[in-house]
Structure formats: structure tokens, C-alpha cells
A protein has these predicted regions:
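Acidic, His- and aromatic-enriched active-site or binding-groove loops in soluble protein domains
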Residues: 87-104, 137, 158-179, 183-195
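CE4/NodB-like, metal-dependent polysaccharide N-deacetylase domain
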Residues: 119-146, 225-240
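Generic structural signal for well-ordered alpha-helices
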Residues: 52-56, 88-92, 121-128, 154, ...
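Alpha-amylase-like alpha-glycosidases and glucanotransferases acting on alpha-linked glucans and related
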Residues: 175-226
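Short, well-structured secondary-structure segments
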Residues: 3-8, 14-116, 140-143, 163-168, ...
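Long, low-complexity, intrinsically disordered segments
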Residues: 440-484
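Active-site and substrate-binding clefts of carbohydrate-active enzymes
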Residues: 2-46, 181-191, 210-211, 225-430
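Short, solvent-exposed loop/turn segments at secondary-structure junctions
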Residues: 10-13, 74-78, 107-110, 147-150, ...
Length: 484
């Protein structure tokens, strides 16, 4: 039986503001708050909210038959928490239907997987904890930034304990093979690989409303037939796309949501089921390893890193950013960590691309890739200065790590002592209350009987007063005072 693996990504980058050379050292805030609020609010209203409501309706209508998967970047979660919490509430409502699986990905939606394995592990752990706190589930399958995958990345992900990973069904890696099978990492067979079908995925996300497309207009019945016509021995078709394809890339007026809501019925008529990534990793056997020497992605015709690292400016910017990666990770300063996450986001490098077809010409506030490069490098100059001021270059990473570990251990000891003091205070307070309660509960003691009055004693006779002695007048002397 053939299964559909339907996956949506939610990512929003943090927009940077105009930052000039003379701002370095004086202004440590790098973000365009107005544009961040405007873009996330617009995307939520026109795409995320109506799309999630449609998916909830599908889950309630089709029950356990319908299933899908989601991943969210950390930057997207932070923006949604601040400006559009309704999206997270709808995701939680969808989660309660039992039809959705949440995947892990790097917190920043950056390139730590190819630049710093330790930073990559740290980011994935932080994002997994965030997903657990929001939805109460622990991700078991990983999706990398931009669907990036290579053998080395796969081995790293397997080492972290994930059972599966999503990847692009790129021609340069598949060759004659089909993306409709389950493969495994060439360096570690424990990691199963689910490969995106680029053609069928982009029929929905990119071509659905293209009036010049020879298949326009696309109906759910036609699309379900295309999937059913795939060879019967091919067990899975992976449809991966950004959630904003529903409402932004393909406007709501194109009836994209009506197409989506009609699709499960048509697929069921063709004997096709839905399955989550974890279910497929458990149910299907790998047909063999998939060697991927160089990283692949789901962007542009080349399906490689060229949209982000295709020119010398992008490479220099990424190298400069990761020159302080270990110090930021080891140091753990919250403000630096937050800036680090935002500056890593892949969109910052894509604005610097000189490829004609990259991003469709959209560059945000920048007039050219060189303008984007200058602005980004100015911000990096200030950011790196702050890192070096807090963690001087004279201290190497091992020494810094040892120093911060000592400080942390001392802080932990103080915290333990504070907790012990609080426990003793609580114990003393409880004992005092118990003693007071016992005193109040005890019956009042009866007063002691008075001793009988002693009989009155006969007063003793008064002693008679002795007669006063006769007064002897003082003899006065004569003329000489009695002197001889």
C-alpha cells in the first residue's frame, strides 16, 4: 500500500535594520521591529491561520486516516509568541487531534551542521526542548535547515539518537533511483532517510496558480491519480513544503485550501494512506544506503548550497560569523546567544546571493547583494566586538570553558546551600506552627486550691516603754570655758 508523507515547515527570519559603520560600538540592537511585526502578522493572517484551520477540519473529518508533520524554527516560534500566538494555539489544537508529528530542526535555521557540530547539537537540543514545552512531545525525526543533508550530517544526526531525517530527492544524488523508497545514511545505517519528491511537491507549492502551466488548473482528483500511477512497488511519496505556500506563494483566491481539503478523499479512493515520518521509519525497511558526499537542499534548480554560499561575500560572512561560535556557545550569555541565533538565520546570507534566480529578486531593504553584505558585516563587526569584550581573546576556549565551569559549579553550590537554608527555614516555621497549635489545643489547667487560712494569733502584749533617763544639764564652764 502506498503512503503519503505530508510535511510543512514554519520559518520566519528576523529582519535586520539599516546599520551603518558609525553605529558599530554605539548601537547593539540590530533588528527592524516594525518589519518583523508586519511580516509575521501578514503571513499569519493570510497563510498560517487559514491553513491550520483547514488542516484541523481535515483531521476532524477524516480521523486517524489523515496525518501530517510539522517543524518550526526557533526564530519563528519567538516571533509567533510575540506577535501572533493564535498560530501556536491552532498548532496545539491540531496536535490534540493526534494526527500530527512535530520534528526537530536547528533553532536558528542556520548552517551550524556544516560549520560547528557542537553548535548544531546545542541548537537541536534547545529546539527539541521548546517543542516539548509547547506541545508535550519529544521529536524523534529531524529536518535540517533548508532540508540540508550530507553523509557527515546524517552521521551526526544518528549519533544524536534520531531515528530518521528528511532530505531532498536531488537528481545529483539519486541518479536513476526513485525518491519513493526509504533509504539510510551511508555512514550510519541507524538513520532512515525520507526523500522529498521535488516535482509533486512543487506542483502544489509553486505551480498550482501558474496560468502558463500546462496542467493548470490542478484538481485534487488529477493529483491523486498522478500519485496512484507511480509504480506499485514504490511505497511512499513525500510531499514537503513551507506552510506559507498555502496562502502566500499560492493566494487563498486560487482555492489552494479547497484543493487541499479535497485531496484526502481522492487519495482514499485510490487506496492511498497518510503516514507520519516516524511511522514510515518504523514500518518500512531501507532499500539501501544513499551516498551524499556534498550537501543537498530543496532550493533552486541545483539543489545545493549555492543560494547561500555561492559567492565569496557569502563565504566570508559565514566564516566571520562562526569565528566566535565556540565562545558564544561556551559563554552562554543570554543576550549574545539571542543575537547569535538571529544572525545565523539562512535568509541573511541569501540576501547576499548574486544568483539571478535566487529568492526571485526579493532582497528586503537592500538595493543589491553588495548593500546586503555591507549591512550584515557592519552588524557582525559590532557583535564580534561585544563577544571579545566579554570573553577576551587572550583566554583560549579550553581556559574559558574551565573558568566558566568553575563559576557555574560555585553558583550551583550556592544554589544548593540556599535551598538547604530555605528548607531549614520552612522546617523551623512548621515546628513553630505545630508547637503553637498544641498549646492552643491543650485544655486550660484548673487553678490550684487555696490553702486554708491560718487561725488568728493572739497578739503579743506590748512591751512597756522604759522610762526616759533623767536629763543631766551640761555643765557650763566659767570664764575660761572650764579649762584649767
Amino acid at each position: 500500500m502506498k503512503s503519503i508523507c505530508l510535511y510543512f515547515e514554519i520559518h520566519q527570519n528576523i529582519h535586520l535594520k539599516r546599520y551603518r559603520f558609525f553605529d558599530i560600538g554605539t548601537d547593539h540592537y540590530y533588528y527592524d521591529d516594525y518589519e518583523n511585526e508586519r511580516s509575521i502578522t501578514e503571513t499569519a493572517e493570510n497563510s498560517y491561520i487559514p491553513a491550520l484551520r483547514a488542516l484541523i477540519e481535515m483531521a476532524e473529518r477524516y480521523g486517524s486516516y489523515f496525518k501530517c508533520a510539522f517543524s518550526l524554527s526557533g526564530t519563528a516560534i519567538e516571533l509567533l509568541e510575540q506577535y501572533s500566538p493564535e498560530v501556536l494555539e491552532l498548532l496545539d489544537q491540531l496536535n490534540r487531534t493526534g494526527c500530527v508529528e512535530f520534528l526537530a530542526e536547528p533553532y536558528s535555521h542556520g548552517f551550524s551542521s556544516i560549520k560547528s557540530p557542537e553548535c548544531f547539537k546545542d541548537e537541536v537540543r534547545r529546539l527539541s526542548r521548546k517543542i516539548k514545552s509547547l506541545f508535550g512531545v519529544e521529536p524523534r525525526v529531524l529536518r535540517n535547515s533548508c532540508l540540508m543533508y550530507s553523509d557527515e550530517i546524517g552521521a551526526l544526526v544518528a549519533e544524536m539518537g534520531f531515528k530518521g531525517m528528511l532530505a531532498e530527492g536531488a537528481k545529483q544524488t539519486l541518479g536513476w533511483k526513485s525518491p519513493h523508497y526509504l533509504y539510510h545514511c551511508a555512514l550510519d545505517p541507524r538513520l532512515k532517510l525520507l526523500l522529498r519528491d521535488p516535482g509533486l511537491s512543487e506542483d502544489i507549492s509553486y505551480r498550482f496558480n501558474d496560468r502558463s502551466w500546462n496542467e493548470y488548473p490542478l484538481y485534487a482528483e488529477t493529483y491523486a491519480r498522478w500519485i496512484a500511477e507511480q509504480p506499485a512497488e514504490q511505497p511512499v511519496v513525500c510531499l514537503f513544503m513551507e506552510l506559507c505556500a498555502l496562502g502566500m506563494f499560492q493566494p487563498l483566491e486560487s482555492n489552494i485550501l479547497e484543493f487541499l481539503k479535497a485531496l484526502p478523499e481522492q487519495l482514499r479512493d485510490q487506496g492511498i494512506t497518510f503516514a507520519t515520518p516516524s511511522e514510515l521509519c518504523e514500518q518500512l525497511e531501507s532499500v539501501g544506503p544513499l551516498p551524499v558526499e556534498y550537501p543537498t537542499t530543496w532550493v533552486d534548480e541545483e539543489r545545493d548550497l549555492s543560494p547561500w554560499l555561492g559567492n565569496i561575500m557569502q563565504q566570508e560572512a559565514l566564516d566571520k560569523l562562526y569565528s566566535v561560535a565556540d565562545r558564544v556557545r561556551i559563554g552562554g550569555d543570554k543576550r549574545l546567544r539571542q543575537d547569535w541565533d538571529y544572525l545565523q538565520a539562512s535568509n541573511n546570507l541569501r540576501f547576499i546571493s548574486t544568483k539571478a534566480n535566487s529568492y526571485g529578486g526579493y532582497r528586503g531593504i537592500y538595493s543589491s547583494p553588495y548593500d546586503a553584505f555591507t549591512n550584515y558585516m557592519n552588524i557582525l563587526g559590532d557583535f564580534i566586538t561585544r563577544v571579545n569584550e566579554l570573553y577576551p581573546l587572550e583566554i583560549d576556549n579550553d581556559e574559558l570553558n574551565a573558568l566558566l565551569t568553575t563559576i557555574k559549579n560555585q553558583g550551583d553550590e550556592l544554589e544548593v546551600k540556599d535551598k538547604e537554608i530555605d528548607k531549614l527555614k520552612n522546617l523551623i516555621g512548621r515546628l513553630e506552627k505545630e508547637a503553637q497549635a498544641r498549646e492552643e489545643a491543650a485544655p486550660a489547667e484548673a487553678p490550684a486550691p487555696e490553702a486554708p487560712a491560718a487561725p488568728a494569733e493572739t497578739p503579743a502584749p506590748k512591751a512597756e516603754k522604759a522610762p526616759a533617763a533623767a536629763h543631766t544639764p551640761k555643765k557650763k564652764g566659767g570664764k575660761h570655758g572650764g579649762k584649767r
